[in-house]
Amino acid sequence: ELAISGYPPRDLLLQEDFINGCLEAGGKISTPIPLLVGSPVPGKPRQRPGNGALRIDSDGAVREVTRKQLLPTYEVFDEARYFSPDSRPGIIRGLGGLDLGVTICEDAWQHSGLVPSDYQTDPIEQLAAWTGQGVELVATVNLSSSPFHATKQSSRLAVARAAAKTLDHPFFLANQVGGNDDLLFDGHSLAALPSGEVVAAPGWVEGVLVVDLDDFSAAQWITSDGADAPSFIASGEER
């Protein structure tokens, strides 16, 4: 979530050049595989910008996939001040040959019942309704900037398990690592199956969690320096 700009960008979002610069930076990402990356995206006429997800292909093409639906305005969050919400979750076709649902952070938390809200919609239920109408999704991805507190990973596990169970397919939560102003992001990205099985990455370390949808036990954690460090959390319990 907002990986290109950092979270939260606050009043920088009032500058059109800043948002355009984020999109240009996305186009400069060199990758042999397609990526989903969080970035602010330009607003529609007479609207604030969106908290978006971009598809970046190996040829450098950048396309907007979706925008965040649920904008939190409690505790450290003030997103409704800066963003306009989308009305539905995203679906991305043919990303590495896969069709995926796409949500952004809070979009998945409403379904778990763990956050105070008066939201009028539930993006996870929307995706579940679409799959019930014949939309075939291999998995759903959630791009997150989920700040750290002492029991936060336990909450994330509950969110992911609830979403995977309702959707009846794997649910992936990719969280930021590091600090931005007064917020700390602990990582602990994870993957959950409808059965409740979870594989989670370690905290406070940048890297890639590689998950085989057919065999969660074969998951690998590769650190940012390219070393294979298989100390992931197979059970998903907090450490």
Locate the predicted segments by residue:
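Enzyme catalytic cores with a strong preference for nitrogen-chemistry domains
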Residues: 1-239
